[in-house]
Design a protein with these regions (language model features):
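Nucleotide/phosphate-binding catalytic cleft detector across ATP-hydrolyzing
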Residues: 1-16, 21-112
Length: 112
């Protein structure tokens, strides 16, 4: 059976947490290559995307389809700068997510 992807994601210094909202599976992944720097949560978007892909692969089990893949990004402390938000959106779109919602925003998702 194939399932649509519906994830929740938290971003921390050099760490990504991903939860599958359907199954309840949760992964807390410490990045092998640091993507944060002093005062910046996402200093290196490429290493952030690499960590995110590895975390997502660990949380997935069973069959998934990327049709209408959704992700909710939890608020961060400190709040993401616009360049960091753009890095998150770009990474998630590169992975295949279509609906990206930042919980700190209005309820409408970022459409593809």
């Amino acid at each position: 059976m194939l399932f649509r992807i519906d994830f929740e994601m938290g971003i921390y210094p050099d760490r990504v947490q991903v939860a599958d909202r359907r199954s309840g599976r949760f992964v807390d992944f410490k990045s092998e290559i640091p993507f944060s720097a002093q005062g910046r949560l996402i200093a290196d978007p490429l290493y952030f995307e690499y960590a995110l892909v590895k975390a997502i692969r660990k949380v997935m089990s069973g069959g998934f389809i990327l049709l209408d893949a959704k992700v909710k990004v939890l608020p961060t402390a400190p709040a993401l700068r616009q360049s960091e938000r753009d890095a998150v959106v770009n990474a998630l779109r590169n992975i295949g997510f279509k609906a990206i919602r930042f919980e700190s925003d209005h309820p409408s998702p970022v459409a593809a």
